[in-house]
Amino acid sequence: MAGAAGPGTVPGAAGGDGDDSLYPIAVLIDELRNEDVQLRLNSIKKLSTIALALGVERTRTELLPFLTDTIYDEDEVLLALAEQLGNFTGLVGGPDFAHCLLPPLESLATVEETVVRDKAVESLRQISQEHTPVALEAHFVPLVKRLASGDWFTSRTSACGLFSVCYPRASNAVKAEIRQHFRSLCSDDTPMVRRAAASKLGEFAKVLELDSVKTEIVPLFTNLASDEQDSVRLLAVEACVSIAQLLSQDDLEALVMPTLRQAAEDKSWRVRYMVADKFSELQKAVGPKIALSDLIPAFQSLLRDCEAEVRAAAAHKVRELCENLPTEGRETVIMNQILPYIKELVSDTNQHVKSALASVIMGLSTVLGKENTIEHLLPLFLAQLKDECPEVRLNIISNLDCVNEVIGIRQLSQSLLPAIVELAEDAKWRVRLAIIEYMPLLAGQLGVEFFDEKLNSLCMAWLVDHVYAIREAATNNLMKLVQKFGTEWAQNTIVPKVLVMANDPNYLHRMTTLFCINALSEACGKEITTKQMLPIVLKMAGDQVANVRFNVAKSLQKIGPILDTNALQGEVKPVLQKLGQDEDMDVKYFAQEAISVLALA
């Protein structure tokens, strides 16, 4: 395989003298054309190794032409190739030769598979930065023009992602050409191309001169926002955020707001959804004055939209919208123009809408302050705590800390309790799991007395749940509670209840005792572990069930480091030695492992 390889021929790695040190490279090169996809993929991923071995000149003259001609491979291989080439500038001789990487990437930017094209565009964008301004106009801009005027829509969609990276460093004449190409793609016959152009409109606007934004980008935005395809119109809404940031208030009001108002009332729910989804960014981009005059009315209609998806997206933005309002007059705007709509959503027919609102409504308490929260928000929180949908109740409980800062949790505690109990016993185990995870937070806010009186029994009940994930989470929960309430509380309240389970007829519950001891020993410290927990663990070493016995060995290994030498040598060692002779293989294995780890051999 020595000598120069023409396009389509695999470049040879080993020279005529049969240098053995290059043999692995020869293998990698052979694998580039192997029938096995996995081998080709493996070789492509090591392309930089091949290039290093060949040197910069042979990489340019042999490897790259070969790669350019093999663009008919499996998508997975092409994706890897597109990614590799983005980091190849140093391997072809540096920025002066970066243009050598353009032909294979240009081919990759036209293939059918979207992920490959996107990766090729990403690599081209990377390489564009490594071109000098002269090389950019000589090599990169012509590539963009070729893609932009290609016969296949695939090449034209790829071009859309390249305009913004080459525009800033181009000469004025070339800039005009680039803008012209972008304009024509915005009105392309193929919806996929118009979609690609719309998705890059905001990015392109940011690198243009202000005059061009007004005279060219805004008309393109207006056209795309009234495109016959809703998938194009919704992308224009996204671009509006970037465009709005570039214009003065007067220009915004005259040039952009009529189109945005129209989008908020679009006949397609997907476009209205996009307006709702981008609402906070739009609010910041247009500024407080226009937000009050134009966006608040639009937001009101989105909160009452006939489509639940749109109402849910708008509900998600309620807190951010209120926080972003200017502090002067904010309370009045929220109370008069937003709160009446929120009250309606609390009893919405759709649970996703109610759930979305429940995830943010608590945050309004910090914006509205103590009096308004007690008078206006508290009734809404209480209504949501009684909602038939568990996700709604859960979202309220998981955001309690917001309210606690403003009014204290006692106001809610009477209604909280039934909601917590219901969730704790919900038929869906994932709901039970979620409430367990909030228990340490709740405990900290409600205080130890309230917790002991109302919630302690729940936490103990979870330890014997029929789902293992719940029992496991309940064990971790106990450890966090001990860290919050201290060892004395653990000794008096938790440890006795846990240890009683060691005599439970169900072996799974007996094992839970061991898991709890593992979790609690560190938090409870040496004295409680030695005096209260260790005797129970040692007693359980004689359990009839092998699973319990090997968990005894694991528990002794876990709590061993906390115990003093006397307890280890006098009590733990004999029990582990006995378990080390057990008839069950697993028990024997874990006992011997514990002896080894605790250095008791």
Curated annotation (Swiss-Prot):
PROSITE patterns: HEAT_REPEAT (PS50077). This is Serine/threonine-protein phosphatase 2A 65 kDa regulatory subunit A beta isoform. PP2A consists of a common heterodimeric core enzyme, composed of a 36 kDa catalytic subunit (subunit C) and a 65 kDa constant regulatory subunit (PR65 or subunit A), that associates with a variety of regulatory subunits. Proteins that associate with the core dimer include three families of regulatory subunits B (the R2/B/PR55/B55, R3/B''/PR72/PR130/PR59 and R5/B'/B56 families), the 48 kDa variable regulatory subunit, viral proteins, and cell signaling molecules. Interacts with IPO9. Interacts with SGO1. Interacts with RAF1. GO terms for biological process: apoptotic process involved in morphogenesis; meiotic sister chromatid cohesion, centromeric; positive regulation of extrinsic apoptotic signaling pathway in absence of ligand; spindle assembly. Pfam families: HEAT, HEAT_2, PPP2R1A-like_HEAT. The PR65 subunit of protein phosphatase 2A serves as a scaffolding molecule to coordinate the assembly of the catalytic subunit and a variable regulatory B subunit. GO terms for cellular component: cytoplasm; cytosol; glutamatergic synapse; membrane raft; nucleus; protein phosphatase type 2A complex; synapse. GO terms for molecular function: protein phosphatase regulator activity. Keywords: Acetylation, Repeat. Each HEAT repeat appears to consist of two alpha helices joined by a hydrophilic region, the intrarepeat loop. The repeat units may be arranged laterally to form a rod-like structure. InterPro entries: ARM-like, ARM-type_fold, HEAT, HEAT_type_2, PP2A/SF3B1-like_HEAT, PP2A_Regulatory_Subunit_A. Transmembrane segments: none annotated. HEAT repeats lie at residues 20-58, 59-96, 97-135, 136-173, 174-212, 213-251, 252-290, 291-333, 334-372, 373-411, 412-450, 451-489, 490-528, 529-567, 568-601. Belongs to the phosphatase 2A regulatory subunit A family. The lineage of its organism: Eukaryota, Metazoa, Chordata, Craniata, Vertebrata. The modification N-acetylalanine is found at A2. It comes from the Eukaryota.
